[in-house]
Amino acid sequence: MAHKLAFIGFGVVGQGLAEILRDKKEALKQNEGFEAEIVAISDLMKGSIYHPGGLDISTVLQVLQETGSLENYPERPGLIRGWDSIRTIKDTNADTIIEVSYTDVKTGQPAIDHCKAAFEKGKNVVMTNKGPVALAYQELSEMAQRHGAYWGFEGTVMSGTPALRMPAAALAGNDITEIRGILNGTTNYILTQMEQDGVSYEAALKEAQELGYAEADPASDVEGYDARYKIVILSNHVMNAPLSVGEVECKGITGITLQDIEKAKAEGKSWRLIAKAKKENGKVIASIAPEKLDAEDPLASIRGSVNAITYQCDLLGTVTLSGAGAGKIETGFSLLIDLISINRERQLISI
């Protein structure tokens, strides 16, 4: 039976997943027994369409590319237009909500309300929005469990690189006592350019903005706020240790000068913005701050916009994972992985 999907938000990431589902349709069916049907899309700017029998995804993508609006999706019997996000979640025949709306990370809204509306209806949610997971992890986890719904958010930390799923599956049985990571590609790109090309912070930031790595207002990245939300998610989900955003000390890279970079190079070291969470005396101490790393540190070799994370395990020792931390297809893939997890659980139940 095909999974019926409703997209809340349909920007770059949502369209990335839609392209994957279209292009890998037969491979997913053959290799995973996975079939999906997009029945609804509700986007604040692009419009809203719903058909219980499914939408033609190639037509959707073509219409958006040519006109930018779902209002130009062709009419057909049974097509419904204009439903808002909450009604789309509650009243469509979707069993899984793809939550990729534009959300205020400081409040987690409207994505938190979207999750609650879905869980109340017993519908699964997969998402890439950090805010709800960092700000309402316990509440939403309990709500999903109470209503028998799956809540997937792999893409909130390192895009499609499995920073959450890998430790849960492959490191099970270990006590993970510390997590250290380069969780923001923008800041790592800036520091790498300063180190390799000898340019100033300002010049490296400008280049990052021109390449699309950094926003016009780069504060979320360069002040460490983005990484702070991610380390909170890692602490709660991977270390099973409650941690709030306000408990994380946060210092960005704006104070790092070219002189600091050159001095570190002379010492055989490298500056990186490190997100850290460590268990101490029964609680977790977490911080975001620039650190001067020895060459032997596995995080010191991570350059450009790549992300990486190191898990300190009581049985296995140090394990480091690196990979893409952003990108249309990469983040779309993170949603696919959560959908495949739902599919595998469904297959186990059916057996």
Residue ranges of model-derived segments:
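Conserved active-site and cofactor/substrate-binding residues in soluble primary-metabolism enzymes
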Residues: I8, V12, G16, A36, ...
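Substrate-binding/catalytic subdomain of NAD(P)-dependent oxidoreductase enzymes
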Residues: L205-S301, A308
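Rossmann-fold NAD(P)-binding glycine/threonine-rich loop
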Residues: Y102-K121, K130-M158, P162-P167
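N-terminal glycine-/serine-/threonine-rich beta1-alpha1-beta2 phosphate-ribose binding loop
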Residues: M1-E120
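Conserved anion/nucleotide-ligand pocket segment
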Residues: A168-Y229, L234
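ATP-dependent carboxylate/acyl-activation modules
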Residues: A2, D297-I351
